[in-house]
Curated annotation (Swiss-Prot):
Protein name: Serine hydroxymethyltransferase
Known pathway: One-carbon metabolism; tetrahydrofolate interconversion; Amino-acid biosynthesis; glycine biosynthesis; glycine from L-serine: step 1/1
Native organism: Bacteroides thetaiotaomicron (strain ATCC 29148 / DSM 2079 / JCM 5827 / CCUG 10774 / NCTC 10582 / VPI-5482 / E50)
Cofactor dependence: pyridoxal 5'-phosphate
Record localization: Cytoplasm
Membership in a protein family: Belongs to the SHMT family.
Main location class: cytoplasm
Residues bound to (6S)-5,6,7,8-tetrahydrofolate: 113, 117-119, 363-365
GO biological process: glycine biosynthetic process from serine; tetrahydrofolate interconversion; tetrahydrofolate metabolic process
UniProt site (Plays an important role in substrate specificity): 221
Molecular function GO labels: glycine hydroxymethyltransferase activity; pyridoxal phosphate binding
InterPro entries attached to this UniProt entry: PyrdxlP-dep_Trfase (IPR015424), PyrdxlP-dep_Trfase_major (IPR015421), PyrdxlP-dep_Trfase_small (IPR015422), Ser_HO-MeTrfase (IPR001085), Ser_HO-MeTrfase-like (IPR049943), Ser_HO-MeTrfase_PLP_BS (IPR019798), SHMT-like_dom (IPR039429)
Keyword field contains Cytoplasm: yes
Annotated catalysed reactions: (6R)-5,10-methylene-5,6,7,8-tetrahydrofolate + glycine + H2O = (6S)-5,6,7,8-tetrahydrofolate + L-serine
Length: 426
């Protein structure tokens, strides 16, 4: 068979882009060679609808083993009693939880998207906001942190069936205990989407929501440094509170509802090559080296945030507890949009994403902020000194967004600097 040079040349171009640049998108990371090998394995050939030991296809004895290893390792990492590793993405995991917990039109509550929430937590352009009825809680305008008193007020007023914690652009620790107390007051299911900080939670650097939430979802890339995918967990399984029964008249456990919501509810056959890669990544997380990596991610984020603050940038909430930060450009560059900032930085081979900030007057296509994160650059071996240098380069670019000569100089500096850093530093 003739090699498809058109596609493989594109793949090599992307490889070079990743090698030469500084990756600061908070949701991105670089996987190890063995995770990559598992994703590119012959397991992609196997259809395996169902779950280990209960498949709708023959010949699943081998993939049953790799999927069960993924389940067992994930449960060990987070202290969960039950886990499902089949969701193709974090959004798919969330959609499955919605299907298991809510009926069409049911009310639920999540963090305002413009304040750092996620599309799958109730955006009106997402199925979560189309099929179900969202209400939202916000950040405190003064502190830039989740306003738990306001969250409780909204919950008591709206009586949501489910409350969601977690977001895509929130740099602070969550008070899961308080959230569970609020959920219990209104009889709501508490779902925590820990997609962003999951790796720091796995390393014991942040509070573990599995101890407090009814249901926890996550992606498997980002700080977990695995393949792109999703998972669902419960600290303790429990009988579903709505009295849904099996054909034999027994009350279904919540795990049964969640398993059915993943398959056949929102997905068909699982991606067993990706699940094997998840298992490999989970095995890496269980090694002592991973905790050191996670500590460095957290250190690098704190140093980068402070270096930017020292240069006059505003960080929403004043800093970070995790791997990420949201930079509000309005104080330092009132006329600069996140869109223009992103384009200028990408031209300098510093990859970031534009992001709305709390109480933003600009649209999601323009924005007044950029989001930064340190998981990927830390995987490459970066330490605190490079964070200081990155802050300097960001300021240089954003002070010269229309000066192609300055941007070219920064790009050359970035490319030269990154020659010292492999994509995955052992």
């Amino acid at each position: 068979m003739k090699r498809d040079d058109l596609i493989f040349d594109i793949i090599e171009k992307e490889h070079q882009r990743q090698l030469k640049g500084i990756e600061l998108i908070a949701s991105e990371n670089f996987v190890s060679d063995q995770v990559m090998q598992a994703m590119g394995s012959c397991l992609t050939n196997k259809y395996a609808e169902g779950y280990p030991g209960k498949r709708y296809y023959g010949g699943c004895e081998v993939v049953d083993q790799s999927e069960q290893i993924a389940i067992d390792r994930l449960k060990e990492i987070f202290g969960a009693e039950w886990a499902n590793v089949q969701p193709h993405s974090g959004a798919q995991a969330n959609a499955a939880v919605f299907l298991a917990v809510l009926n069409p039109g049911d009310k639920f509550m999540g963090l305002n998207l413009a304040h750092g929430g996620h599309l799958s937590h109730g955006s009106l352009v997402n199925t979560s906001g189309i099929i179900y009825t969202p209400c939202e809680y916000n950040l405190n305008q003064e502190t830039g942190r989740v306003d738990y008193d306001q969250m409780e007020e909204v919950a008591l007023r709206e009586k949501p069936k489910m409350i969601i914690g977690g977001g895509s652009a929130y740099s602070r620790e969550w008070d899961y205990k308080r959230m569970r107390e609020i959920a219990d007051k209104v009889g709501a299911i508490l779902m925590i989407d820990m997609a962003h900080p999951a790796g720091l939670i796995a390393a014991g650097l942040l509070e573990n929501p599995v101890k407090y939430a009814h249901i926890v979802t996550s992606t498997t890339h980002k700080t977990l440094r695995g393949p792109r995918g999703g998972v669902i967990m419960m600290g303790k399984d429990f009988p579903n509170p709505w009295g849904k029964k099996t054909p034999k008249g027994e009350i279904k456990m919540m795990s049964q509802l969640l398993d059915s919501a993943v398959f056949p509810g929102v997905q068909g056959g699982p991606l067993e090559h990706v699940i094997a890669a998840k298992a490999v990544a989970f095995g890496e997380i269980l090694q002592p080296e991973y905790k050191e990596y996670a500590k460095q991610v957290q250190k690098n984020a704190a140093i980068l945030a402070q270096a930017l603050i020292d240069r006059g940038f505003t960080i929403v909430s004043g800093g970070t507890d995790n791997h990420s930060m949201l930079v509000d450009l309005r104080s330092k560059y009132p006329d600069l949009t996140g869109k223009v900032a992103e384009k200028a930085l990408v031209s300098a081979d510093i990859t970031v994403n534009k992001n709305m900030v709390p109480f933003d007057s600009r649209s999601a296509f323009q924005t007044s902020g950029i989001r930064l994160g340190t998981p990927a650059i830390t995987t490459r071996g970066a330490k605190e000194d490079l964070m200081i240098e990155i802050a300097e380069m960001i300021e240089t670019v954003l002070s010269n967004v229309e000066n192609e000569e300055v941007i070219a100089q920064v790009r050359a500096r970035v490319n030269e600097t990154m020659k010292k850093y492999p994509l995955f530093a052992d």
